[in-house]
Regions:
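N-terminal glycine-rich, Lys/His-bearing helix-loop that initiates the first secondary-structure elements
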Residues: 1-52, 432, 464-465, 470-476
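Conserved PLP-enzyme active-site core in the AAT-like
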Residues: 8-16, 64, 71, 84-305
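Conserved N-terminal alpha-helix of the aminotransferase class I/II PLP-enzyme fold
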Residues: 48-88
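Gly-rich Lys/Arg/Thr-decorated short loops/hinges at beta-loop-alpha junctions or inter-strand turns
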Residues: 50-59, 75, 125-135, 316-317
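Short glycine-rich or small-residue beta-strand-to-loop segments that form or flank ligand, phosphate
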Residues: 59, 80-82, 160-163, 321, ...
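Generic structural signal for residues in well-ordered beta-strands
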Residues: 79-80, 125, 346, 472
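Short, compositionally biased
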Residues: 122, 127, 456-467
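Conserved C-terminal alpha-helix-loop-beta "cap" of PLP-dependent enzymes
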Residues: 288-463
Length: 476
């Protein structure tokens, strides 16, 4: 890496030059540097709204970059800058390699953006059902033996998609999967929404590009310090960059936010220059928090002790995932208590676990406050866990492709009456955004009970036409 070159931030520098010129705007956006919306300017600040500008020659154009945006992408190792979140990056990957009828091998515990891409392009999923840790109620990684079996049984598949890592920090044998897939001429796509730091920290699981994957969708905003909704799509050698750009432009906005673009540019510079040091501190804070939480009693903050060489090939130690059923509370209940009673906002709570996202903006005093609150919750709210559900993953039975089911003729039924039917829509807790049900899957009584239980516990649910999640669209 050329550290001298990495000190540059071309988009940020161009915006600074633009700001100093005091250009009179007769273009969009219509707030005209905030003058037309003083309440917005007061909320965000005049400098912020003053830099919310449209594409122009001095600032380049994301859809066809030739100057400062192109320079920024080159400094990010030929990455595509994305302003539609990692959702758009994941969909860009899949649409770049899959066409209607193509098979793609992937774990079922993927983010909804991956299955949405299958709805758009008509590709057919070949699911490698992940192993499940029944004690923790979480799905694990892709066992390489199952991946090998799927590749052997589906030699016509065009790609394999891998989570690296999962939301909970679980990593599969990415290098091994890449080797197997490439031997059969398949592309390897990595959803690294939760893996930005893998490119900068020491002692962390291998990142997708180093493992030889063909493409990786990376959420710079999650752990890299850029603004929400900003992301990157990385390409390895052998991918046609011009074709991928065309695919991205099918769905990406033509009005890219320069606030998002400049945040990617600045964050890339910061991580290139100081990322190793910054994430070294993150690892220390996460390990400290894990040890402190485990000393409380009742909780289990898991880490590398889960590694088994197969379904948990490695573990991302920056992830502070905590099992809560030991104190008789669902993860979502602890999540709500932390926010409502202690003014602590963590990433998510599910049926069995919580996740506190630790990154470059955290301080040790924040960690102490979280640990203290969890100790308080254990002391004040602990109860018997009898009767609580422990499963987080339900293996699906796929009857038809997501696209076919999504566009099929459907009817709305009360959830309690849908067992045995084929789902025509998604149901998921968000976060993490992993579908409990996806279009084309059979609804079982177990799934119905799980959805009702998750609702009862207060999980934030989405995906259905019915905003109350009381009815489901099923195929006629």
């Amino acid at each position: 890496m050329d550290l001298e070159a990495q000190k540059r931030a071309p988009i940020y520098e161009a915006l600074e030059r633009f700001r100093k010129k005091r250009v009179v705007p007769f273009d969009v956006p219509g707030h005209k540097r905030g003058r037309g919306n003083p309440e917005l300017a007061a909320l965000l600040g005049e400098k912020c709204v003053g830099l919310d500008v449209n594409s122009m020659k001095p600032l380049d154009n994301l859809c066809h970059p030739v100057s400062v945006i192109r320079e920024a992408e080159e400094l990010a190792a030929e990455a595509f800058l994305m302003v539609g979140g990692t959702t758009s990056a994941v969909q860009g990957m899949i649409l770049s390699v899959c066409k209607a009828g193509d098979k793609i091998i992937l774990p079922r515990n993927v983010h909804k953006s991956a299955i949405n891409a299958l709805v758009l392009c008509g590709a057919v999923p070949v699911y490698v059902n992940p192993e499940v840790n029944g004690d923790l109620g979480i799905s694990l990684g892709m066992d390489i033996r199952k991946v090998e079996k799927a590749i052997e049984e589906n030699p016509d598949a065009v790609a394999v998609l891998v989570n690296n890592p999962t939301y909970y920090g679980i990593c599969s044998d990415l290098r091994g999967i890449v080797k197997l897939a490439h031997e059969k001429g398949m592309k390897v796509l990595a959803d690294e929404a939760h893996g930005t730091h893998l490119y900068f920290g020491k002692g962390l699981p291998v990142n997708a590009m180093a493992a030889g994957a063909d493409m990786a969708a990376v959420s710079m905003h999650k752990s890299g310090g850029s603004l929400t909704q900003s992301s990157m799509l990385l390409l390895n050698k052998g991918m046609n960059q011009d074709y991928v750009r065309q695919i991205i432009n099918l769905t990406q906005t033509t009005s890219a936010s320069y606030l998002l673009l400049s945040s990617l540019d600045i964050s890339r510079r910061n991580l290139a220059l100081r990322g190793e040091e910054s994430f070294g501190k993150v690892i220390q804070m996460a390990e400290y928090a894990r040890n402190e939480i485990n000393s409380i009693g009742g909780y289990y903050a898991y880490g590398k002790d889960l590694v088994n060489g197969t379904s948990v090939y490695d573990f991302d130690v920056t992830k502070l995932s905590v099992y809560t059923l030991g104190i008789g509370l669902a993860g979502i209940e602890v999540y709500d208590l932390l926010r409502d009673e202690y003014d602590i906002q963590i990433e998510f709570g599910d049926i069995c676990n919580i996740l506190a996202y630790i990154s470059i903006g955290d301080r040790i005093q924040d960690i102490e406050r979280l640990v203290g609150a969890l100790a308080d919750i254990e002391r004040l709210y602990r109860k018997d866990k009898t009767g609580m559900l422990t499963g987080e993953y339900i293996s699906p039975k796929v009857e038809c492709s997501p696209q076919k089911a999504f566009y099929a003729q459907k009817v709305s039924l009360p959830i309690e009456q849908t067992a045995g039917k084929i789902s025509g829509e998604f149901v998921m807790c968000y976060p993490p955004g992993i579908p409990i049900l996806a279009p084309g899957e059979v609804i079982t009584q177990e799934i119905v009970e799980y959805i009702l239980y998750a609702k009862e516990k207060g999980c934030s649910m989405q995906g259905t036409e019915d905003p109350k999640i009381e009815r489901l669209m099923v195929l006629v």
